[in-house]
Amino acid sequence: MNKLIISTGLLFLLVTTGFTQSKINPTERQKVADYLQEISVTIRAQSEYSKSEGSGVLISRKIGDENVTFVWTCGHVVDNMRKVRSVIRGGSPKKLVEFGDVQIIKELVEEGRRVGEIKMDASVVKYSDADDGEDLALLMVRAKDYAKDSANFHITKANHGIVPIGTELFHVGSLLGQRGSNSMTAGIVSQVGRILGKVEYDQTTVTAFPGSSGGGVYLQNGKYVGMIVRGAGEGFNLMVPVRRMERWATEHDILWALNPALEAPSMKEIKALPVETTGEEVKDEDEEKSFKDKQFPYMIRIIKDSKEPELKELIWTKSSDIDVDHK
C-alpha cells in the first residue's frame, strides 16, 4: 500500500513538473520541425570592419493593406550597426541614435539539399542594449509579404508565464552562423529565474553555439517560450523567457509584435517609435560595453575584418576586445 501511495505521488510530481516525455507522433513532430524552419532566420550585421551573425524569429502582422514581417532577436546581434550622431536642435546639442540595415537570410532546401538563400534588408524598429537594458531588438523586413508563417508566442497568465523545469524544448538557430543555419536541437528547461546583471533568464540544456543568439526556444508543439542569449558550455545555456519579452514590449508599446490578438499600429506610428530607450544617457558607439562575461558569453558569431582573406571567428565579449585591423 505504501509503495502504491509513493508511486502515485511520484507520478503526480512528474506530471505537474513537466518531466513526462511527450508523445508526439512522427508526423506531428515533422510538421513542427518544418514550421520552426520556416519562422527561423539568420541575421547578419555587417559594418565596415566586422561582420556578426546571429539568429532571429519571424512574426507577420497586417499593417494597413500590407503584410509586414518583423523579426525578434537579441540587441547585441545588431549592436555593431549602431551609430551615434551629434546634432544641434533648439540651440542645444543632442545625440541621435541611428542603425544601419541588417540582412535577414533565409536558407532554401529542396529534396534534402541546400539550393540557395534569400537575403532581405531589415531596419531596427526597437533596441535595448545589453548593458543598460533587456538586450532585445525588434526588426522590420523592408520587403512586403516576406514570411509565409509567423511565430506563436507562449503568452499566458498561468503560473506567471513560467515554463516548468523539465519541460522538453526545441531550439532552432544559426549555430556557427550561416553555415549552421536553421539547425535544430533539443533539451529541457533546467532552471528558471536565474539573475545575471540584474535581469532574469531561464536556463536550458538545448545545444547552442556562437550564432545561436536571438534564436527561438520552443515547446514541442512549436510555441515560442524564449530566446537564446548566453551560454556556458554544452548543456548550460541562458534564454530570455517570453514573460520578460512581454514586460519589455508592454513598456515600449510594441506588445502587438508578440500578441497578434492586439491591433497593430499604422506604419507611420511604427516609424515614429524611438529606436532606443534605455532610461540612461545615450552612449557613444565606441564607448566600452560590459559584454565580457567569462562564465556566460554571448552566443554570437563574429568575423573580424571581413575584408581579410582569412576570416577569424570568436564569441563576442565586448567591443574593446575585438582586435580589428583598420586599413
Q: Which stretches of residues belong to each language-model region?
A:
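Positively charged n-region of N-terminal signal peptides that target proteins for export
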Residues: 1-4
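Bacterial N-terminal signal peptides
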Residues: 7-16
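C-terminal cap/linker of serine protease catalytic domains
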Residues: 21-31, 82-108, 115, 147-149, ...
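Flexible, gly/ser-rich surface segments that form the specificity/activation loops bordering the active-site cleft
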Residues: 28, 116, 126-130, 148-200, ...
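A conserved glycine-rich beta-strand in the N-terminal activation segment of trypsin-fold
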Residues: 28, 40-72, 214
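Conserved hydrophobic positions within beta-strands
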Residues: 56-58, 124, 189
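Catalytic nucleophile loop of clan PA
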Residues: 57-58, 207-228
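Catalytic-histidine neighborhood of serine endopeptidases
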Residues: 61-129
